[in-house]
């Protein structure tokens, strides 16, 4: 039996591979059974932090409600495009299309804004959040726009909208059932 003497990571790989094989053969019940096994095994290996994420999101929502809009004139600063959405919703495609423009720098999935926000909170607000963020971007040309599709930018959307004058937020949305199935079938490296 191929499953004997395998560690959890190897079992996850086997279950996902089996699921894909059964799916290609049109044997959807067997495919689903292996998907359930793979995802259950992944939950054993990587505990869900959903409660922590929900709590953090709620706290940041309250912070954004209390955050004053930055009305300073920042014409000399670049446009920051934040792309938010669930994994497997099309955000990578959107970022790729936007980044075809030579005046757009693709930052990928970096948490520069979260780091800037933490620094802003620790500095007791002596420095402007948008200035901290733009310094971390290290963009010297104000005509260069940036895209950032870090998975957790949605938590900061309210603060981004108020703190970064030249920010644009693009919410990528896909049918939730399609999205859930796509995430469930995807074998991400972690989590």
PLM feature segments, named:
Residues 101-107, 111-123, 140-191:
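PAPS-dependent sulfotransferase catalytic domain
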Residues 1-140:
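Alpha-helical solenoid repeat scaffolds of the TPR/TPR-like class and their adjacent stem/linker regions
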């Amino acid at each position: 039996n191929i499953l004997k003497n395998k560690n959890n990571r190897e079992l996850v790989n086997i279950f996902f591979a089996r699921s894909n094989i059964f799916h290609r053969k049109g044997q959807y019940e067997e495919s689903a059974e292996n998907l359930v096994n793979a995802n259950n095994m992944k939950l054993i290996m990587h505990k869900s932090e959903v409660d922590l994420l929900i709590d953090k999101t709620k706290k940041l929502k309250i912070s954004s409600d209390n955050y004053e809009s930055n009305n300073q004139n920042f014409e000399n600063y670049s446009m920051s495009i934040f792309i938010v959405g669930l994994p497997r919703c099309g955000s990578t495609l959107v970022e790729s299309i936007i980044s075809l423009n030579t005046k757009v720098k693709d930052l990928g999935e970096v948490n520069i804004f979260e780091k800037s926000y933490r620094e802003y909170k620790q500095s007791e607000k002596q420095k402007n959040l948008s200035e901290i963020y733009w310094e971390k971007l290290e963009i010297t040309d104000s005509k260069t726009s940036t895209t950032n599709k870090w998975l957790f930018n949605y938590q900061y959307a309210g603060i981004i909208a108020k703190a970064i004058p030249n920010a644009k937020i693009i919410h990528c949305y896909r049918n939730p059932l399609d999205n859930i199935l796509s995430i469930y079938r995807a074998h991400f490296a972690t989590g």
